[in-house]
């Protein structure tokens, strides 16, 4: 069995999960605090996707902490298969939500100039939330690849 960076039950795995939680939570807070986000489906989808990512990552971070405290091995093929599927599903959902929200944000900023016409829209917060969502996705993608690599090595 290989020692893969970011595998469950390791410090690197826990740090990946905690980073996912922090950035997903920050993305949700930035978007939820923006005026008028609920009028646009892509932004609601971003909140739902980042909320799901937050819950998934928090659960796995807690599992990593438990594993580190009790020195249990989480490299069971069935358990790692569950992690692989969960990571890939949340990675795809998060990337789709971040991309859709980025498209709407660019449309507002550059194409139709909604941000100038309607200054009450929080376009800066929309942008911040999208940036945080893409950072979250980069951590999720790293985790998904390492889980897949670990599964292949079991």
UniProtKB/Swiss-Prot annotation:
Membrane-protein topology: Multi-pass membrane protein
Entry keyword annotation includes Membrane: yes
Residues annotated as transmembrane: 18-38, 43-63, 78-98, 130-150
Ranges of the Extracellular topological domain: 39-42, 99-129
Example of a GO cellular component annotation carried by this entry: membrane
Record's subcellular location: Cell membrane
Record has Transmembrane helix as a keyword: yes
Membrane side Cytoplasmic: residue ranges: 1-17, 64-77, 151-154
Designated name of the protein: CASP-like protein 5B3
Organism, as annotated: Oryza sativa subsp. japonica
Species classification: Eukaryota, Viridiplantae, Streptophyta, Embryophyta, Tracheophyta
């Amino acid at each position: 069995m290989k020692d893969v960076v970011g595998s469950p039950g390791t410090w690197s795995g826990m740090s990946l999960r905690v980073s996912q939680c922090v950035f997903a939570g920050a993305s949700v807070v930035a978007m939820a605090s923006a005026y008028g986000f609920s009028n646009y489906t892509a932004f609601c989808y971003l909140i739902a996707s980042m909320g799901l990512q937050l819950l998934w990552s928090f659960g796995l971070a807690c599992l990593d902490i438990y594993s580190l405290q009790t020195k249990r091995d989480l490299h069971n093929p069935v358990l790692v298969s569950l992690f692989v599927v969960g990571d890939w599903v949340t990675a795809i959902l998060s990337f789709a939500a971040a991309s859709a929200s980025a498209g709407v944000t660019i449309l507002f900023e550059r194409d139709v100039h909604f941000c100038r016409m309607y200054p009450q829209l929080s376009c800066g917060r929309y942008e911040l939330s999208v940036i945080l969502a893409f950072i979250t996705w980069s951590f999720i993608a790293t985790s998904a690849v390492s889980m897949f690599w670990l599964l292949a090595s079991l």
